[in-house]
Each structure stands twice: as C-alpha cells, then as structure tokens.
C-alpha cells in the first residue's frame, strides 16, 4: 500500500512540472526498484528511459584508481558528451548502450525527448553530472530485502560481487 501511495504521489508531482522536457533522475541502492519505478512511470506518464547501466565503463578504461571510486564503473565522459548536451533540446537523439555480453558498445538507443526523460540507475545523480535534472528520486532498501532481490535477479555467485564490491561503493557514494 505504501509503495502505491508513493508512486501515485510522485506521478502527480511530476505531472505538475512545466510542460517542456522534464528530466527525472532515479538513483538509489542496487535492487531498490529504480528500473521498475522508471518503467511504471513511463507506462503512466509516457516518455523515455535512459539506463545508467548503458554507460558501464569499458575494460580499456578500468584502472585500479577508477574502480575504487564510488561510481567509477560508470563511463561519465560518454554520458556527459552523448546525453547531457541533448536533454534540454527537445529534439530526438540517440546514444550507444554498453553491451556487457560483448564488453563493447552496442546498439543505438533512440530518445524521443519530447516529454518526460527518466535517467535511472545508481549514480544518476552523481555530482560530476551537475544539476541537470528537474527532480531527483532516491530509492532506499533494507539490507535483507536487497540481498534477496539480488540473489533472485543475479544468482548466488553474483551476490558475492555485490556484497564485496558494488554495495560498499554505493554506500560510500
């Protein structure tokens, strides 16, 4: 019930934003429901979703220093050049998503950019991006539920990666 009220209140707040390109960043802890919330908001309000997972850092740029930074696994430079300059234009654009199965850039992802644009994923509100969004949403989750969701989504083997690497970096962020 609480999540339905949260969703309805958020959707109503977003409807009240001025009618131009409305940019909403959905950040939060892993497995907190960022992707699910973005999909529900698009279904309710329309718009585009840009996934921060599409900006995974390519292997050639992974240095120990970069990987030790909170958010260092995000290819900020590409997000800053391919997405941010285009968000307020009101014109369609595209960016290339990172394909983790090939560890290389993959298909072009079109963004209609004529209403709501939801930028979802961990580090979508990172200070390196500045204050590009009209609204910030941060989703929290308790540790037990987080572990259960990661185990279900990624499997037991990958859960250990999250517990030892990704969650500590997100907590530092």
Regions found by a protein language model. Name each.
Residues 37:
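Hydrophobic positions on the alpha1 helix immediately C-terminal to the Walker A/P-loop
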Residues 104-153:
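ATP-dependent NMP and nucleoside kinases share a basic, alpha-helical "lid"
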Residues 1-24:
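Extreme N-terminal, non-catalytic leader segments
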Residues 29:
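P-loop (Walker A) phosphate-binding loop of NTP-binding proteins
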Residues 48, 61-105, 116:
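Conserved nucleotide-sensing/catalytic segment adjacent to the nucleotide-binding pocket
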Residues 45-60:
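Short beta-strand-centered segment that lines the nucleotide-binding/catalytic pocket of NTP-utilizing
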Residues 34:
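Conserved lysine of the Walker
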Residues 104, 126, 155-173:
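Small-molecule kinase domains that catalyze NTP-dependent phosphoryl transfer to phosphate-bearing small molecules
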């Amino acid at each position: 019930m609480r999540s339905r009220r949260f969703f309805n209140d958020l959707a109503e707040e977003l409807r009240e934003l001025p009618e131009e390109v409305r940019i909403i960043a959905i950040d939060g802890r892993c497995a907190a429901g960022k992707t699910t919330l973005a999909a529900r908001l698009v279904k309710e309000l329309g718009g585009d979703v840009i996934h921060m997972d599409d900006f995974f850092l390519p292997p050639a740029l992974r240095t120990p220093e970069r990987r030790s930074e909170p958010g260092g696994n995000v290819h900020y430079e590409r997000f800053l050049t391919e997405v941010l300059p285009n968000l307020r234009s009101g014109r369609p654009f595209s960016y290339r998503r990172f394909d983790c199965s090939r560890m290389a850039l993959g298909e072009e992802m079109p963004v209609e950019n004529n209403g709501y644009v939801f930028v979802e994923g961990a580090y979508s509100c990172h200070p390196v991006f500045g204050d590009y969004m009209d609204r910030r949403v941060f989703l929290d989750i308790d540790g037990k539920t987080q572990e259960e969701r990661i185990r279900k989504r990624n499997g037991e083997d990958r859960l250990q990666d999250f517990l030892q690497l990704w969650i500590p970096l997100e907590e530092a962020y």
